[in-house]
Structure formats: C-alpha cells, structure tokens
C-alpha cells in the first residue's frame, strides 16, 4: 500500500459511509446520543432479564433494522447481566442464530455462516478459522495491515493535526479486509456501500466479487479469497464438495461487512479513552503489553456492538420469564461487560485491572471469527501513531468527542494534534 494508493480512496465518500450520524447508520440507531450505561445499570439492578427490546428499554424509540430486529410479530426479551448473557450465547441448542426453526428447509438453506448453528456451522467455520487464529496475525500484518497503517500516517503526518476517526481508524480495516479479498482500493468504498444497504447493494457486491472468484479458481494467490475458493466442505449427506460461488459470496458478504464495519469504531473508542487518560497513553507508548491491555479494556468498557440477538428454539425460562419458542432474545453485551458483580468500578477505563473474559467479541460458538485480526489491526495502528506522531494529544480547539449510537457505537470524531 502506497501514498498513491491512498489517493484513490475518495475522502468525502469515506466520511459519508462512516458517519454514525448519517444515513448509513440511521437504521442502526447511529444518531442516538444518550449515555446508555446508566439505563443499563438501572435495568440490571431490577432484574437480569426484561420483556422488550433493548432500544426502547433504554429510551431509543427510532425505527431499527438490525440483527434480531424488527420482528414485530414475535415476543422480545433483553438480557443485561453477564452470567445470563454468557449462558445465552453458549447455549446454541436453545438460543439459535437463525430466525428459522431448527431442521427446517429455510434453516438448512442458510448461506450465511452467521445464521448457521450446530454441526453445519462448525463445518463451515472450520474452513476459514485457520486464517484467523492468533499465529496468523503476522500474515495479516505483513500482507495488508502494516503497509496500510503507514501509508495513511504518511498522508497526514505533515499536517500536524487529523481526525483519526475516519481517515485512519475506518480506512485501516476497510482496506485490510477488502485487500484480503482481492478488491482494489478504488472499489473498496463500493464494497462498503454495497454491504451497508440492507440487501439493496447485493447486485453491486456480486458484480465486484464474482470476477475475483473466477480469477482465483484459475490461479490462487496468497489471500483470503483464494482460501475460500479452494476449500472443500462436507455436506449433511457426507459428500465433499468445493465451495460453490453462492457459498463463497455468502462468506465474503459477512466477512467484508463485519471486517469493514466494526474494528474502526472500537479503535476510535480505544484512542479516545487513551487520549483522555494521558498517563495510560504514555504507558502504552512505552510498553506494548500496556497497549494490549488498553485494547482489551476498551472492548470490555465500551464494546462497539453492545447488543446481539438469538432466537429461542423451544419454550424455555430465562431470568424468571417464560420465553416461548420463536422469541427474540437480545443479549446486551455492553451491559454485561459492566456488571458490578464481575468487575469492580465497572464504569472506569482501567487497563491495569485484572484481565478476565468479557463479551466484547461476543461468546460461544459464534464468538467473533476476526477478533485476532481486529486486535492486530488496533495494536499495529495505535503503536504506529504513538511512535510516529510526537506529543500526540486531543485537539483542544475541536469539539470533544462523544460515543454515540444504539446498536453500533463509536466516537463522533477523534481530533488530534501532534508535533
């Protein structure tokens, strides 16, 4: 990745696609600007489970199209403590990732690994899991992350100031994941636009990715899409087949959507936390272990995806409530990660606290596939900023950043000065 490559990433469009207050995130409650954590605490204190949807329960009454929403014809339940959230995401037999009844034709025809469960989910996840294990982080860093990070810093280093939220934090995971699928820089924003149109951009997505699939079938390269193109999977009948184009497109859509849409907000959250705590910022600059701890603490303290849903496969009981089969159960990871029964001073950002498991990347069989890549992106990017930009600090003349959003949360900006 070079400076000339960066010039192909149109800045105005980049800002539009990653504006939490803009149209792209409107259906996810992007402009909801209340502090959601007092409401999370209030709800948890009166019981771990509440009938209803997280948004309205905390004061957000806008329309929302998100995983588990809207489903107006189904009962909804929301979970706010750590133990119950953890139990829900671990129990895939009772709380499914698919909206369809287990064993139904619709469930068996799911093309998205996110919506699969059980043995079928494990078979498909196993295909790409080796590319996302911790020891493969170096591959991602050397192939895409490191060059992207330094090319981006080159583009604004002489200015003495920058808004890191979009021109840095958003661009890194976008160019990393699209690069791993063989998508050129000029088309990276087209991919991002396609995967954020709630199904309306599928034609554009296929037009870009299908030719790459065909090219990799003829000649593999050292990238993620080649791994998918040449993977084989065993079906329910025990027959082995090479992944079809539709199966690859399903994988690609999920990985490109998630890979370009989550890490940037978490990186911004981590940076604003460190910039607001200068002692921790200095410690993170001097010690990579402190930076790793800071990233992990930001995932606990303010996860960018605070809510994820499951679907009850049978009549069950949860937190004292009868939950009918087909109900939507919203696991509120943001509330769970500040459960005072698990963490002392849960509202404080404290990278020095004892490390224990959190739900910043979800949990159970569907724990985030790309979590080690996300950690590598944040570690590499923030370390490079601290090394290359002397006296990095929040811009005193800019508006103070705020973390906003209902179902996807991130900072309004990360304005910095340096030098």
Report each predicted region and the residues it spans.
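Cytochrome P450
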Residues: 1-419
């Amino acid at each position: 990745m070079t400076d000339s490559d960066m010039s192909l990433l149109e800045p105005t469009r980049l800002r539009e696609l990653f504006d939490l207050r803009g149209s792209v995130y409107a259906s996810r409650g992007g402009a909801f600007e209340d502090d959601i954590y007092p409401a999370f605490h209030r709800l948890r204190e009166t019981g771990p489970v509440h009938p209803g949807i997280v948004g309205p329960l905390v004061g957000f009454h806008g329309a929302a199209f998100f995983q588990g929403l809207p489903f107006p014809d189904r009962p909804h339940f929301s979970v706010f403590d750590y133990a119950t959230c953890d139990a829900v995401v671990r129990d895939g037999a009772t709380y499914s990732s698919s909206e369809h009844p287990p064993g139904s034709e619709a469930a068996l025809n799911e093309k998205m690994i996110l919506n699969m469960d059980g043995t079928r989910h494990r078979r498909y996840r196993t295909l790409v899991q080796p590319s996302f294990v911790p020891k493969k982080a170096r591959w991602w860093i050397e192939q895409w992350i490191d060059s992207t990070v330094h090319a981006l810093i080159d583009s604004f280093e002489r200015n003495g100031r920058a808004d890191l939220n979009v021109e840095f934090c958003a661009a890194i995971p976008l160019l990393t994941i699209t690069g791993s699928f063989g998508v050129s820089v000029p088309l990276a924003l087209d991919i991002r636009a396609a995967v954020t149109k709630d199904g309306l951009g599928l034609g554009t997505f296929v037009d870009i990715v299908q030719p790459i699939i065909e090219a990799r079938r003829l000649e593999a390269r050292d990238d993620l899409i080649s791994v998918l193109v040449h993977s084989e999977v065993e079906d329910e009948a025990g027959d082995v087949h090479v992944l079809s184009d539709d199966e690859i497109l399903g994988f690609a859509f999920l990985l490109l959507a998630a890979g370009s849409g989550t890490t940037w907000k978490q990186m911004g959250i981590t940076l604003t936390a460190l910039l607001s705590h200068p002692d921790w910022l200095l410690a993170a600059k001097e010690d990579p272990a402190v930076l790793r701890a800071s990233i992990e603490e930001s995932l606990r303290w303010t996860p960018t995806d605070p809510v994820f849903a499951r679907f009850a496969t049978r009549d069950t009981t949860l937190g004292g409530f009868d939950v009918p089969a087909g109900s939507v159960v919203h696991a509120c990871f943001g509330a769970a990660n500040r459960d005072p029964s698990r963490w002392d001073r849960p509202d404080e950002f404290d990278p020095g606290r004892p490390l224990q498991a959190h739900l910043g990347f979800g949990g159970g069989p569907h724990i985030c596939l790309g979590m080690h890549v996300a950690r590598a992106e944040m570690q590499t990017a923030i370390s490079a900023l601290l090394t290359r930009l002397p006296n990095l600090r929040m811009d005193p003349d800019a508006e103070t950043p705020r973390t906003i959003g209902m179902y996807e949360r991130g900072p309004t900006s990360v304005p910095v000065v340096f030098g």
